Amino acid sequence: MIDKDGMAPWEICGMCHSADGISRMSKFPILAGQKATYLKSQMLDFRQGRRLNDGGQMSSIVTEVDPATIDGIVGYFAGLPGPLMNLVVQPGVDQVAYEAGRLLFEEGRSGAVACNVCHNDGHPAAPRLRAQHAAYLRKQLNDFKYERRVSEGATVMTSIAKLLTENEIDSISVYLHSSGSYDSDVAH
């Protein structure tokens, strides 16, 4: 149980995801600037027990959140500026993995549709992925692939992730983590 006295509703989430929505720990995804529709659907999936691929940690936390505050929490994180990263590939990034990930994300390959078909600003249900923690992305793709992440809308991702090799999952994760930034749904 979390002692919520004196806390704004979003501060409960900020304990792991950071007050600025840019978690410094790769286990916790960056929420700043994420699409509000996506954030709300994930909170509801955790709350209603439809998403369990984190060992139940989020379900137990989200059930402590007053349902009347969910829209405010979502609005807070969606309205924060997304992470800013240099559009130049950072030193130390595996260039081969980066380029392979870029090609998969932007062009796809035989049998696998390009990621950016859905993961772009025009598709409200698909999350923004650029600048997200590579380890988090890798885990989510593997959870889809091995059917550990099952929730509303997961069927499409499961079928796509099953087509990816471990090297491709790694490459996509490296590319997205290192490939830039995005703006939030709210103008700054």
Task: Show the residue positions of the predicted features.
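Electrostatic cytochrome c docking/interface patches
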Residues: 1-10, 24-27, 79-109, 188
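Gly/Gly-Pro-rich "capping" loops immediately C-terminal to redox-active cysteine motifs
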Residues: 3-6, 14, 18-50, 59-64, ...
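N-terminal alpha-helical segment
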Residues: 9, 22-24, 54-55, 97, ...
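The canonical Cys-X-X-Cys-His
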Residues: 13-20, 73, 77, 101, ...
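Generic structural signal for alpha-helix termini and adjacent loop/cap motifs
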Residues: 19, 48-49, 79-83, 107-108, ...
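Residue-level hotspots at or immediately adjacent to binding/recognition sites across diverse folds
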Residues: 19, 57, 154, 177
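C-terminal capping alpha-helices of c-type cytochrome domains
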Residues: 63-88, 160-188
